[in-house]
């Protein structure tokens, strides 16, 4: 550390961090001419060297120019200069403070004095507030209508192809794909056919609604099974849980339930994917398959590809006895 720099650190105004008043700051921002603590120096580094060129007072080598910047600067001079702008005083974070016009004026003023030239304040247009910038940048972009039209055409094609298949044959033999209901008010005790046709039939009229309703039906089915397990197994026998044999029966029931849910999801997902492979991708090998794979995989494949349920019947529950 140079003698001049050592003398600057001994001045009373430089014995506290400029930003947080922590004692004995061991870091400095050359182009701002201020002494700062370790914590604040990390935030200053995040501003970039154009905004704040951070150096360690004891561990870094200093050039004569850098030391001179600290001489013409200093915490006291910086405070006097920056406090004239209400925006700097009102700023909440280090990033906000040193992205103000007054902070840029300080950098230019120090540079001019080190170069031995007169500093002239530059008039700048009023900058947009940081709050407005954040609000603008965080606005969710709207989805282009072209994308929606392309999706509608794609799913309409699926519905048209499926409607031409015979409904008296299974899908594996070229028959029509049946599946999820198409109405939110579907009676769970009635078939999908009696409640508006199959899932793929509805794609031709309202693709987005069909996909949404299909997943809602599946979700309600799973939810109903969970309620059945709770009503049939858990609630009636809660007082018997201390019996080892009873606990074993409970765990076997839960394992079977979990396996059934997973297998149901896998079958439904496989059926839909098979239809796409047979009718869309086979006709147009150049079709952008990844886009629709991602859209269709999102709810179904997550369940179908999940790991097997843990066998709770093998767990040791003695600690609850």
Swiss-Prot record:
Decide whether keyword Zinc is in the record: yes
Reply yes or no: does the keyword Phosphoprotein apply.
Answer: no
- Name the CDD domains on file: ArfGap_ArfGap1 (cd08830)
Record-level GO cellular component terms: cytoplasm; Golgi membrane
One Gene Ontology BP term is: COPI coating of Golgi vesicle
Task performed by this protein: GTPase-activating protein for the ADP ribosylation factor family.
Give the protein's recorded name.
Uncharacterized protein C622.14
């Amino acid at each position: 550390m140079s003698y001049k720099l050592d003398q600057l650190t001994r001045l009373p105004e430089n014995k506290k961090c400029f930003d947080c008043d922590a004692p004995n700051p061991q870091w400095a921002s050359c182009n701002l001419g201020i002494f700062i603590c370790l914590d604040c120096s990390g935030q200053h580094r995040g501003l970039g060297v154009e905004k704040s060129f951070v150096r360690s007072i004891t561990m870094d080598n200093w050039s004569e120019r850098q030391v001179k910047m600290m001489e013409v600067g200093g915490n006291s001079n910086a405070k006097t200069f920056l406090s004239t702008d209400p925006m700097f005083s009102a700023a909440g974070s280090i990033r906000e403070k040193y992205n103000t016009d007054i902070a840029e004026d300080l950098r230019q003023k120090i540079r001019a004095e080190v170069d031995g030239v007169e500093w002239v304040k530059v008039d700048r247009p009023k900058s947009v507030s940081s709050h407005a910038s954040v609000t603008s940048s965080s606005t969710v972009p709207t989805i282009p209508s072209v994308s929606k039209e392309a999706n509608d055409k794609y799913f309409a094609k699926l519905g048209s192809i499926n409607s031409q298949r015979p409904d008296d044959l299974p899908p594996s033999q070229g028959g029509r794909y049946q599946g999820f209901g198409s109405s939110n008010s579907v009676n769970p005790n009635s078939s999908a056919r009696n409640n508006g046709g199959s899932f793929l039939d509805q794609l031709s009229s309202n693709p987005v609604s069909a996909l949404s309703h299909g997943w809602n039906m599946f979700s309600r089915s799973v939810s109903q099974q969970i309620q059945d397990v709770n009503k049939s197994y858990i609630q009636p026998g809660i007082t018997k849980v201390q019996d080892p044999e009873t606990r074993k029966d409970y765990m076997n029931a839960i394992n079977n339930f979990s396996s059934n849910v997973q297998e149901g999801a896998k079958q439904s997902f496989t059926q839909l994917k098979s239809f796409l492979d047979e009718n869309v991708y086979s006709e147009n090998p150049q079709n952008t398959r990844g886009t629709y794979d991602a859209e269709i995989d999102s709810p179904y494949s997550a369940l179908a590809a999940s790991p097997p349920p843990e066998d709770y019947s093998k767990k040791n529950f003695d600690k609850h006895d």
